[in-house]
Amino acid sequence: GLNYNSSIDDMELQAMLVTEQSRSKNNNTLWSYLPGTMKEVTTIAPMMESAAYQVSLFTQDEGVEEQLKALSESHTGIIHIATHGYYQPTSSNGMDSSGLIFAGANNFWSSLQERSKSEFDDGVLTAKEISNLNLIGTDLVVLSACQTALGDISGEGVFGLQRAFKKAGVQSLLMSLWEVD
């Protein structure tokens, strides 16, 4: 469970903590809290720990976009993300047409604030941003979110989250073609 209404101050604090440790705005729809995601990750975490995986949970205000970006070059074996996903076929750039929603995204999704005015990320992680990460060494990414396997189709294949994570170096993906309720 992520807090999509996380305050800007909390987001800035979390962004600074992540930095020390290692956009879309086309409508006014706000992202609602997904209570099932908290149950999902707190159920999976002990299972992974019992299988000798190191587990880091980032929920509520800690679930900022920078947490995923901080995994770049970390050779994390498995990444499981339970949140909102989106696909907007009207985007002019295929890699901007889909993404994942992180804590605090409602502050930017529905407001007139510009990304350039912020010293931290906006909580909306696009496929384009993901494609610039180095996730080599990541065996599996699980995206428990709506429509994560959708993308724009061109002569070069599908442009979306699947291409972004593969370009970033992820070996395998578990994604959905439908809305997750």
Predicted regions mapped to residue ranges:
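Catalytic cores of enzymes
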Residues: G1-D181
